[in-house]
């Protein structure tokens, strides 16, 4: 979707109750109470212009015709697997495997995959790329000139090979060890080092504590090639894979080619279960302070954890309603934070809030505040954003603030609707990848425009103020401060207490 997505409303019981309350508020304007309580939350429609299917082996595909740009298409394969699936002796292998997808497949040995794509204008590292994260791995071949003879067939064949036919040659594996070691040595930024330090404390006692995708160089430099092959065979399988093709193509023809090309990949009998690991709650705040000589400024993260919306609960209109509500909350709070930057001596350099995954975990969300502080007044910057969050929790927002934020939200939605025929391939691809990986809704802008314009006027500011009280509570707080390693710079110890508003 074009609009910023925010989600989550506290623990499961409170979220379900609040969704029902919001739906009642929306219906009450046109129904009597008996009709209201007889209603069930309707499902979110799926955009009729995307074709979605699933092969017998479990592989899912998404296909959409889009002519911007003309004669171009994007080809993606998303895997519901990342570094969280690694065992201790495999740390770094999800990322290593991503590298190996460009170092030899059954139909594209050696470097021929990159060579072929660059011959037709698809540049490695630009239009040909991939990423590995905690819970997912995604590969893309973008901006492909589909009017080039054989380009469509070849790109689908590449996706097929990534899915099931990597060669994983021992010599190529050994060559790649040094490449990844150099990447680890030269590309690890100060923020990445901070994140590695944060994980064990933020996720103590869980699988997330030691799952940074780059892994450990001890494993990367010493694992046996068969260990990588075992990981590939166990986790790269059709029931965890989704193909996305969007562009100036014939949808029927692409669907036929996908069925022909991918149906021969066998489903795995007795396949390992793909687990989604929980995140522990904490009654007392978790406080982290770290320094790095390459960190340019003092930055503080304030996380207020809450339960993530389960995948199966994202299919009804209530999820769009909570998304709308939480987005408006963060927009109003950010407007307040931005106002404080307009004074003669602002308390911080930058501050914002949002609601999304709790750092790296999809099973927990967090209402998150970020503040970049002045080095000579760190405590004021931190206390100011904490005070504004607490003020919003205790006293909520005014009708004037809400009217202004709602109007701005609806203006953005109107603009997206009016320009719906100008969307490029990448924006559709991102939506479909998120639908496959996380079950995020894909109603299409026309359906979303209709639904939001129906429900937004019926949701009062009092409902949003109730939600704010559930997003920020006295438990499940995590505060992390990161600053430069600089002589004379003192970082506060952060004996954390909620400030008075």
Language-model features: where?
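Active-site-adjacent, His/Asp/Glu-enriched structural segments that form or flank metal-binding
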Residues: 69-71, 79-194, 212, 222-240, ...
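Proteolytic maturation boundary segments
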Residues: 38-63, 250-338, 342-344, 403-407, ...
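Acidic/histidine-enriched alpha-helical segments
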Residues: 110, 114-118, 167-185, 196, ...
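Bacterial Sec-dependent N-terminal signal peptides
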Residues: 14-40
């Amino acid at each position: 979707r074009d609009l910023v997505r925010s989600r989550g409303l506290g623990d499961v019981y409170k979220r379900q109750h609040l969704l029902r309350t919001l739906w009642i508020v929306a219906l009450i304007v046109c129904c009597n109470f008996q009709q209201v309580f007889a209603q069930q939350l309707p499902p979110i429609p799926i955009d009729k212009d995307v074709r979605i299917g699933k092969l017998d082996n479990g592989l899912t595909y998404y296909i959409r015709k889009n002519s911007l740009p003309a004669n171009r298409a994007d080809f993606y394969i998303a895997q519901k697997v990342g570094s969280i699936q690694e065992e201790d002796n495999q740390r770094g292998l999800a990322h290593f495997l991503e590298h190996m997808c460009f170092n030899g497949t059954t139909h594209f040995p050696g470097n021929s995959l990159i060579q072929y794509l660059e011959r037709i204008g698809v540049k490695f590292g630009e239009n040909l790329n991939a990423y590995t994260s905690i819970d997912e791995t995604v590969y893309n071949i973008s901006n492909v000139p589909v009017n080039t003879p054989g380009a469509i067939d070849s790109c689908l064949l590449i996706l097929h090979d990534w899915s099931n036919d990597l060669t994983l040659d021992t010599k190529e594996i050994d060559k790649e060890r040094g490449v990844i070691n150099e990447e680890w040595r030269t590309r690890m930024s100060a923020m990445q080092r901070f994140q590695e330090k944060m994980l064990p404390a933020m996720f103590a006692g869980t699988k997330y504590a030691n799952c940074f995708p780059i892994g450990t160089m001890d494993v990367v430099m010493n694992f046996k090639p068969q260990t990588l092959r075992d990981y590939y065979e166990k986790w790269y399988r059709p029931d965890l894979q989704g193909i996305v093709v969007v562009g100036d193509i014939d949808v029927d023809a692409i669907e036929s080619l996908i069925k022909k090309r991918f149906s021969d990949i066998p489903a795995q009998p007795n396949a390992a279960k793909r687990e989604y690991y929980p995140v522990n709650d904490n009654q007392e705040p978790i406080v982290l302070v770290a320094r790095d000589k390459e960190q340019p400024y003092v930055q503080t993260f304030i996380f207020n954890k809450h339960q993530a919306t389960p995948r199966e609960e994202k299919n009804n209109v209530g999820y769009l309603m909570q998304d709308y509500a939480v987005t408006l909350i963060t927009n109003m709070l950010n407007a307040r934070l931005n106002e404080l930057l307009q004074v003669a001596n602002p308390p911080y350099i930058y501050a914002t809030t949002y609601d999304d995954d709790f750092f790296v975990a999809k099973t927990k969300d967090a209402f998150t505040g970020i503040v970049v502080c002045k080095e000579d007044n760190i405590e004021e910057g931190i206390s100011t954003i904490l005070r504004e969050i607490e003020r919003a929790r205790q006293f909520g927002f005014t009708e004037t603030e809400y009217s202004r934020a709602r109007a701005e939200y609806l203006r953005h939605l109107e603009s997206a609707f009016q320009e719906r025929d100008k969307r490029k391939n990448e924006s559709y691809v991102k939506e479909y990848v998120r639908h496959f990986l996380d079950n995020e809704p894909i109603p299409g802008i026309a359906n979303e425009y209709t639904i939001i314009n129906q429900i937004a006027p019926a949701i009062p500011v009092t409902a949003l103020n109730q939600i704010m009280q559930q997003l920020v509570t006295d438990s499940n707080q995590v505060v992390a401060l990161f600053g430069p390693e600089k002589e004379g710079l003192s970082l506060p110890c952060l004996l954390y207490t909620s400030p008075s508003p």
